From Swiss-Prot:
This is NADH-quinone oxidoreductase subunit C. NDH-1 is composed of 14 different subunits. Subunits NuoB, C, D, E, F, and G constitute the peripheral sector of the complex. GO terms for molecular function: NADH dehydrogenase (ubiquinone) activity; NADH:ubiquinone reductase (non-electrogenic) activity; quinone binding. It is a peripheral membrane protein. Gene3D superfamilies: NADH:ubiquinone oxidoreductase, 30kDa subunit. One of its GO terms (cellular component) is plasma membrane. It holds the Pfam family Complex1_30kDa.
């Protein structure tokens, strides 16, 4: 693929700025991506990018759970029928600590230099996941980090108000984790006798309805 001269120039300049850190960069499909090796360097590197290459906007913060990455099928044992995929088995996951299970991703924009980049980092501990907040660098990170915490259970050190933002404050679990059941753990309904909303254990059977498909 032919890379534009301007994009290559931006890539080389940013690579030079980050030369003192454990960072790997690439240009793929017309996009610049940098991967940070040590999550403890995230705040310092992003601060450096904002100051020295004028990335004054953080457009998004998100995460990815790689718990089942690379598995070509659900773990369904011997329940695959002759007519195709079985619908009679609940999918179970191993939830033990897995290094590099989660990856956090930052999307940055420099209007002064007319360039966007992606900065990402694999997180080392899958049980206690702690990343320094960048809400002091970009106010837009405040709610974006709250969403990542809510959906993935990643905690942000020094965040001013780390609360759930999409689910209820009493919600159990983190819905975008691969080991979170599709039915959830509890369901909510209005109880006329009590005059309030109540939570009850989910009574829906969790069943695998479709085969797992990974496309190259």
């Amino acid at each position: 693929m032919i890379v534009s001269t301007k994009l290559q120039d931006h890539f080389e300049k940013i690579t030079k700025i980050l030369s003192g850190f454990g960072v790997e960069g690439c240009i793929s499909y017309g996009e610049i991506t940098f991967s940070i090796r040590d999550q403890r360097d995230i705040h310092l590197i992003l601060k450096k990018l904002k100051k020295e290459y004028l990335f004054e906007q953080l457009t998004d913060v998100t995460a990815v759970d790689y718990l089942t990455y690379g598995q070509s099928d659900w773990q369904v044992g011997k329940v695959v029928s002759q007519t195709g995929f079985s619908r009679g088995r609940q999918q179970d996951f191993k939830t033990a600590a897995v290094d590099n299970r989660f990856e956090i991703i930052y999307q940055l924009l420099s209007m002064a230099n007319n360039v966007r980049i992606r900065v990402k980092c694999k997180l080392k501990d899958a049980q206690i996941i702690l990343v320094d907040s960048v809400s002091d660098l970009w106010p837009s990170a405040n709610w974006a980090e709250r969403e990542v915490y809510d959906m993935f259970g990643i905690y942000f050190n020094n965040h001013p108000d780390l609360r759930r933002v999409l689910t209820d404050y009493g919600f159990v679990g983190h819905p975008l984790r691969k080991d979170f059941p599709q039915t959830g753990y509890v369901e909510m309904r209005y109880d006329e006798n009590l005059g309030r909303v109540v939570y009850e254990p989910v009574e829906i059977d969790d069943r695998v309805n479709t085969p797992r498909v990974i496309r190259n």
